[in-house]
Amino acid sequence: MNMLTALLVNITLSMLLIIIAFWLPQLNLYTEKANPYECGFDPMGSARLPFSMKFFLVAITFLLFDLEIALLLPLPWAIQMYYINIMMSTAFILVSVLALGLAYEWLQKGLEWTE
């Protein structure tokens, strides 16, 4: 199987799945589906209250800096490679960029809870 055949099969299957995904959903809109659900009980208050943007920003910041672990996980296996200088410089650049991002976030008071 050559590359063109594999590409055509993948594109065809992807398009078929996208078309099926748009055709299958039922368009029955029930009001119960839009209501909030709290462990089987009626909500005590309004579930549509706005939340603090600080929580959202801290969550996004956590996700961005949590990628550091995912990117540095292969580091012990990469040490066994022949190109250790390239691997160490790449890891150093990655950690430096993340440290600069943390310093910028700190200086912009993105980690402060009080306003």
From Swiss-Prot:
Pfam families hit by this protein: Oxidored_q4 (PF00507)
Q: Which UniProt keywords apply?
A: Electron transport, Membrane, Mitochondrion, Mitochondrion inner membrane, NAD, Respiratory chain, Translocase, Transmembrane, Transmembrane helix, Transport, Ubiquinone
Q: Which domain of life is it from?
A: Eukaryota
Query: What compartments host this protein?
Result: Mitochondrion inner membrane
Has the keyword Transmembrane been applied to this entry? yes
Q: In what way does this protein cross or attach to the membrane?
A: Multi-pass membrane protein
> What are the annotated GO cellular component locations?
mitochondrial inner membrane; NADH dehydrogenase complex
TM annotation in the entry? 4-24, 55-75, 83-103
Gene3D superfamilies given for it?
NADH:ubiquinone/plastoquinone oxidoreductase, chain 3
Q: Which reaction does it catalyse?
A: a ubiquinone + NADH + 5 H(+)(in) = a ubiquinol + NAD(+) + 4 H(+)(out)
What enzyme class is recorded for this protein?
A: translocase
Q: Name one GO molecular function term.
A: NADH dehydrogenase (ubiquinone) activity
* UniProt cross-references to InterPro entries, sorted A to Z: NADH_UbQ/plastoQ_OxRdtase_su3, NDAH_ubi_oxred_su3_sf
Q: Does the keyword NAD apply?
A: yes
Which EC number(s) does UniProt give? 7.1.1.2
GO BP terms: namely: mitochondrial electron transport, NADH to ubiquinone
Instruction: Give the family this protein belongs to, as stated in its UniProt record.
Output: Belongs to the complex I subunit 3 family.
The protein's job, in short, is:
Core subunit of the mitochondrial membrane respiratory chain NADH dehydrogenase (Complex I) which catalyzes electron transfer from NADH through the respiratory chain, using ubiquinone as an electron acceptor. Essential for the catalytic activity of complex I.
Q: How does it assemble?
A: Core subunit of respiratory chain NADH dehydrogenase (Complex I) which is composed of 45 different subunits. Interacts with TMEM186. Interacts with TMEM242.
Protein name from the UniProt record: NADH-ubiquinone oxidoreductase chain 3
**Source organism per UniProt:** Peromyscus polionotus (Oldfield mouse)
